[in-house]
Amino acid sequence: MAAPRPPPGRLSGVMMPAPIQDLEALRALTALFKEQRNRDTAPRTIFQRVLDILKKSSHAVELACRDPSQVEHLASSLQLITECFRCLRNACIECSVNQNSIRNLGTIGVAVDLILLFRELRVEQDSLLTAFRCGLQFLGNIASRNEDSQSVVWMHAFPELFLSCLNHPDRKIVAYSSMILFTSLNSERMKELEENLNIAIDVVEAHQKQPESEWPFLIITDHFLKSPELVKAMYAKMSNQERVTLLDLMIAKIVGDEPLTKDDAPVFLSHAELIASTFVDQCKIVLKLTSEQHTDDEEALATIRLLDVLCEKTANTDLLGYLQVFPGLLERVIDLLRLIHVAGNDSTNIFSACASIKADGDVSSVAEGFKSHLIRLIGNLCYKNKDNQDKVNELDGIPLILDSCGLDDSNPFLTQWVVYAIRNLTEDNSQNQDLIAKMEEQGLADASLLKKMGFEVEKRGDKLILKSTSDTPQL
């Protein structure tokens, strides 16, 4: 006569399979832990049993890493590992008691070691990929809103796990490892990233490849951009494509729906120093684009994005004052505008005033946008700043700006920023107003163009007066 089966264990009134010895028992636990009441009443002994199964099954993975011929025998072990991770993952959802119990058993270290073994196997098996993903989900859940677990995850996972997973070909593995990194990061751990820049750059690359994934985006905007030291170190080591991605996210943060906070302002001032100094040093690289061989030069395109960032930063009142007095910035912008203007006049190239507007009205050439933004930046830097207004005059920038619009007045984007710049240059500045009035009289400024821009010249006795018309500028 067969021995009677032991009665099933109970989880505070919920029937539980016991002992947990096989796949069906683990699957039953996984299903039970989908409900909060079962998670809240789970005994610690359950998690010890799951850990024992996980450790036993991991031995097969270790063997396969040493002997590749053993990979084909992994199927049953991978099934058990996957279900262990699913069970633990579900148990941790909104349950700090379970998070603490599982952590205190040493499960996090076992899980991280196993995940690193998965990466070593380098074989394409759906079952391996599923176990890999579930392991990362477990680490994300045990660390969620639990600082003690975050510390243990960081201790075991940094930097090897992130170096192994953030550049993985599987999109879900990249997303889940990004979730773990986002959850675990704090100000102290950010300093460790400065010594492991490859991880930070891998996050930027992950966002570049998966812009729809929220975790890499949040890591960059909520953590990286709050650390000027990290951004500076990253920028120096990045490829130009990665720089463009980072600068795009910086723009998104500045122009986003939520205004910069008081804490953000000093940080973005530090970014402004990096962006402005880099632009001043490297902006002439853009002239490479005048050559047909360099029309897609990544370094030049990254420099164009620096200008886009400067335009948005100078549109922010908290950042404008710093950049208005930044050494050499205004002079370099005017100098570059002149060089581009001459290049566009001398030959047919990417800076020439031809065929730059698409049928839908968008500027089709990044170079045309660059010229517009140079003029926009001059206008921003001269906003209510007499010193900069006078400096533009001294550098013969006013005729240059007017001539830029005259050559290609079919471009509404360029015309818009010329109007804006001229208004800022002439506001409360009689010297600049007189200059434009005299240019009109001498035929150096087109009266019809000035009228389109909302200005007209009036003669009062021996004086020429530049005044605004009541008409809206015709853009």
UniProtKB/Swiss-Prot annotation:
Belongs to the ataxin-10 family. It is found in: Cytoplasm, Perinuclear region; Cytoplasm, Cytoskeleton, Cilium basal body; Cytoplasm, Cytoskeleton, Microtubule organizing center, Centrosome, Centriole; Midbody. Transmembrane segments: none annotated. It comes from Bos taurus (Bovine). Homooligomer. Interacts with GNB2. Interacts with IQCB1. Interacts with OGT. Its main location: cytoplasm. The modification Phosphoserine is found at residues 12, 77, 430. The modification Phosphothreonine is found at residue 82. May play a role in the regulation of cytokinesis. May play a role in signaling by stimulating protein glycosylation. Induces neuritogenesis by activating the Ras-MAP kinase pathway and is necessary for the survival of cerebellar neurons. Does not appear to play a major role in ciliogenesis. The modification Omega-N-methylarginine is found at residue 10. Keywords: Cell cycle, Cell division, Cell projection, Cytoplasm, Cytoskeleton, Methylation, Phosphoprotein, Ubl conjugation. Polyubiquitinated. GO terms for cellular component: centriole; ciliary basal body; cytoplasm; cytosol; midbody; perinuclear region of cytoplasm. This is Ataxin-10. PANTHER family: ATAXIN-10 (PTHR13255:SF0).
